[in-house]
Amino acid sequence: MKWIKKGTFSGKQYRDDVSRKISWGHWFAFFNIIVAIFIGARYAFIIDWPDTLAGKLYFFVSLLGHFSFNVFALYLLVVFPLSFIVKNHRTFRGLTVIFSTICTTLLLFDTAVFNRFNLHLSSVVWNLLVNPENGEMSRDWQIFFAPMPIILLAQMLFSRWSWEKLRSLERQKWLKGTGIFLTTTFIATHLIYAWADAYLYRPITMQRSNFPLSYPMTARSFLEKHGFLDGEEYTQKLAQEGRLDALKIDYPKKELTYAPITHKPNILLVTVSGLRHDAISNEKMPKLAKFATSSTEFTNHYSTGNSNNAGLIGLFYGLNANYTDSILSNHTQSVLIEKLRAENYQLGLFSATNFKDSIFRQALFREIKLSSNKTNKPNNESAVKNLNDFIKAQKTDSPWFAYLDLALEAKNPSDYDRTLQDIDSLLAKALESTPLENTLVIITSEHGLTFNEMNQKERENYFGRDEIQVPLLVYWKDLPVGKQNGLSNHADIFSALMQTVFRVENPLMDYSQGRNLFDLKGDDWVLASNFRWNVVIQPDGTQYHIDRKGNYKKFDKDYIEQSSDRPPLGIFLEAFQLQNFFFEK
């Protein structure tokens, strides 16, 4: 190539040229640091802005430290080597300008992507947005490349001006002090975050993903090793209060209004943690199978996640499970429970596990005094007995809401089948004491149960049908008896109760991500989630997984991973909007 001249890379002239290019590169990098900080300031208007002064100050410190480090790192990785390789200074500056223009444009594009999807740019997100199959969407995003000529012009002008004024610029002494200051902000960013992570200071830890290529330092293992941190207590506190990077939640979006309720049915909601989608049959649960013949059975129903908390978020909040940590950390109340109390429903809450799942005491029933069961060890039998006593004590003219939380634990299929028989008998007793003529009965599961051998991390991210497809029986006089094969999930149950029973007048988007289950139309797709993955499930069981970093996988109905470069554009655009809609901005 002409711009890489042959000959030896030695001699005084060569060293002087390289020295001048390196000196110019420092000033050009400084210029781009300012540009990056200016563009990066836009994230302040996108993120969940912290409430505390320390949180606000950390944003500005991290803004300066993060972008100054990343720009200078790119200079060292790309521009600095070019100083030695490319001998022609015009070609060298031209390549540097082009590279800087591309990076600056991508940063500007990332702010737009983050604003819409709360995701930073990745190969999967890029393929979704710059998609020739959707010309209109492509045109929308191409608008963000319109400033590229302006950015290129600014880079060219500064490149030429700084090269011509280099001798004058080299006499400036303040650049060294500025460099030390920016280096200090970078170090402070990581040290402050490590402190906040260790002491659970959420106004700072919630800013973990503010910027692209952001990987703040943590020091839990170091502090635990040297006795400054109790690892077990720390993990338990996280489980109770939600992950540290959880955002604030805006739920419901608007104040809910209701039409007058002419008839208040009793409501019995039963969840059996670990009940698989194929459990209700004459062979495994004959009594419940008999009850199913007089109920509406939803055969293609999914939980909103793969844990108890995740399923309960869908049932009681109508949201997908990626809001779990936000609900825990903000102690967000369920509008369903609030409405039940406002309508003077008698509440009966019974748990075989003493409400051990954090969502119960941290948020869902936080305003309700729950029994501790200190004298007798709670189990399925005692929970059902307490439920039956509660139902018998109710007056016929006073509506009640009863929630029965049962647990199904088994290590292998044979243990599972034996436990099913016990659960079947207990549910039969509960239904016998229930006045069905005036009661809406819902029986489902927070999530299923898998017998596959997996470690903890694999189990947390497992979304096979045995784990997230669950049975659903609804006994309700206004529903047709029989099997419904349409796709549904737990958020649809919540929406049905709010719309059909309590006659909320707001549109669903104000308070729920589900559809009305009782419309019986079925969903085009449903969403299951955990703190990392969002899983789109289609009626045929096909799953599309995308995580918070833009990684993507596709699975068939048997949970066998398929080769796929890109998920369906329309579905994922809707899914992205759903996963961020109720986060406060």
Curated annotation (Swiss-Prot):
InterPro entries, per database record: Alkaline_phosphatase_core_sf, Sulfatase_N, YejM-like, YejM_N
GO CC field: plasma membrane
Transmembrane segments: none
Coiled-coil spans in chain: none
Domain of life: Bacteria
Gene3D superfamilies reported in the protein's UniProt record: Alkaline Phosphatase, subunit A
Name by which UniProt lists this protein: Uncharacterized protein HI_0841
Organism: Haemophilus influenzae (strain ATCC 51907 / DSM 11121 / KW20 / Rd)
